[in-house]
Swiss-Prot record:
GO terms for molecular function: structural constituent of ribosome. The keyword Cell membrane does not apply. Belongs to the universal ribosomal protein uL30 family. Part of the 50S ribosomal subunit. Keywords: Ribonucleoprotein, Ribosomal protein. The lineage of its organism: Bacteria, Pseudomonadati, Pseudomonadota, Alphaproteobacteria, Rhodospirillales. Disulfide bonds: none annotated. NCBIfam families: rpmD_bact. GO terms for biological process: translation. This is Large ribosomal subunit protein uL30. It comes from the Bacteria. The gene is rpmD. The keyword Ribosomal protein applies. GO terms for cellular component: cytosolic large ribosomal subunit.
């Protein structure tokens, strides 16, 4: 049987304008570059770490 991997839905709710360059780069790394863009990502420790870095700029929903 194939295992279903957990996913998280991440939506950008904050603007990267005026933010540090590493926070902007993290948004781009998650595939978010414009307001209200949504991505469904695999729930891995690396992705969770990136989300923690920019928690004030994104909304996260577990799927």
């Amino acid at each position: 049987m194939a295992e279903t991997s957990k996913t998280v839905v991440v939506t950008q709710i904050g603007s990267p304008i005026g933010r540090r360059s590493d926070q902007r780069a993290t948004l781009i790394g998650l595939g978010l570059n414009k307001m209200n863009r949504t991505r469904e990502l695999e729930d891995t420790p690396a992705v969770r770490g990136m989300i923690d870095k920019i928690a004030h700029l994104v909304r996260v929903e577990d799927v």
